[in-house]
Amino acid sequence: MSILKIHAREIFDSRGNPTVEVDLYTKKGLFRAAVPSGASTGIYEALELRDNDKTRYMGKGVKRAVKYINEFLAPALCNQDVTVIEQEKIDKLMLDMDGTENKYKFGANAILGVSLAVCKAGAAEKGVPLYRHIADLAGNPEVILPVPAFNVINGGSHAGNKLAMQEFMILPVGASSFKDAMRIGAEVYHNLKNVIKEKYGKDATNVGDEGGFAPNILENKEALKLLKNAIGKAGYTDKIVIGMDVAASEFYKGGKYDLDFKSPDDPSRYIPSDKLADLYKGFVKDYPVVSIEDPFDQDDWEAWSKFTASTSIQVVGDDLTVTNPKRIAKGVAEKSCNCLLLKVNQIGSVTESLQACKMAQSSGWGVMVSHRSGETEDTLISDLVVGLCTGQIKTGAPCRSERLAKYNQLMRIEEELGAKAKFAGKNFRHPI
């Protein structure tokens, strides 16, 4: 079925910044997709096109990206004899029209908006759920419900506190189903709120961009202590493990790391990568930490390889790999990490996201699907994680509607699958 009409507009993300939304029409109806936006972005991500007009939205407008869709991509796709089922063909057409390596001409936010809408329309055209359509595109006969990684303590670039490390997550791997994992996660979240309130006062329970609490603590170990305490109080010590996103590129300075980077600069406190690695090993020894994302800077390749070789935990590449096949290939060759963080807007199309996922999985890596800190109510990544069978997703705390929208969609999918629903659980790293 051919595309009848495509219309893009500016909408707002969860931080009050403009982002791109695309409406795509076929004979089956309207299919709408919205594009997320990150705060701690890797320098190798595909280009997110902003207007840079300082008189409007502090330069963050996306009128140019919207214009490129409405005036270039839309007419080209509506005039093509392609059906919305042909995801790869449509994505390739847009990539060829852009003609640059990092989507410099139209912007990844323009191409992705259309690509996501096409994916939704393709599922409707086939008369199957979106997760099944994505599984078909990826060549997966089965589908799997993921373990949610709830980001319940926010630091780094996501919060106004002194905490350097960006995310402290709980993963209910001992749950019996996705719905059960949600209940466990929510109960720990509420226990954590009480633990923080008792120790630091009510102000400390304000939340960050992803719905996690942002108490004004400096010591990263203190965040882990708070988590351990809340997990124990909720009664789930045997069912929950901990994950972290350090986002170390945010505090990498001149070859070293500044764990107090939000304070006035003082080079005497910077530490080298091996000292930082020792800190992580201490966390793993003292707490149930099983996953660490971006432990080092995106170009500190040697530190990555050294650390990954020395540990059995999951080491996740985000800023390092930016969902980009070339960076993933280098990471595989150098054994830099053992898990890919998959963010559709880092690469900028559904087809390339699927290719990145397949590449990581075929290299023996795990894959974790991820939201961005600037999110919308769009829930496509919920269907994506189920269809790609990655076994793990991070999309914030069980708080803030743009986060819950994804988790609620996953509960609906599990309900729809009924007896056929498989939950990744303790096999979240390699669920297939």
Swiss-Prot record:
Note describing how the cofactor binds: Binds two Mg(2+) per subunit. Required for catalysis and for stabilizing the dimer.
Residues where Mg(2+) 1 binds: 40
Pathway: Carbohydrate degradation; glycolysis; pyruvate from D-glyceraldehyde 3-phosphate: step 4/5
GO biological process: glycolytic process
Keywords: Allergen, Cytoplasm, Glycolysis, Lyase, Magnesium, Metal-binding
Catalytic reactions of this protein: (2R)-2-phosphoglycerate = phosphoenolpyruvate + H2O
Main location: cytoplasm
Residues annotated to bind Mg(2+) 2: 245, 293, 318
EC number, UniProt record: 4.2.1.11
Cellular location(s): Cytoplasm
GO cellular component: phosphopyruvate hydratase complex
Annotated binding of substrate, by residue: 158, 167, 293, 318, 370-373, 394
Active-site positions on this chain: 210, 343
GO molecular function: magnesium ion binding; phosphopyruvate hydratase activity
EC primary class: lyase
Family of this protein: Belongs to the enolase family.
The protein's role, per its UniProt record: Multifunctional enzyme that, as well as its role in glycolysis, plays a part in various processes such as growth control, hypoxia tolerance and allergic responses.
Quaternary structure (record): Dimer.
Name of the protein this chain belongs to: Alpha-enolase
Gene: ENO1
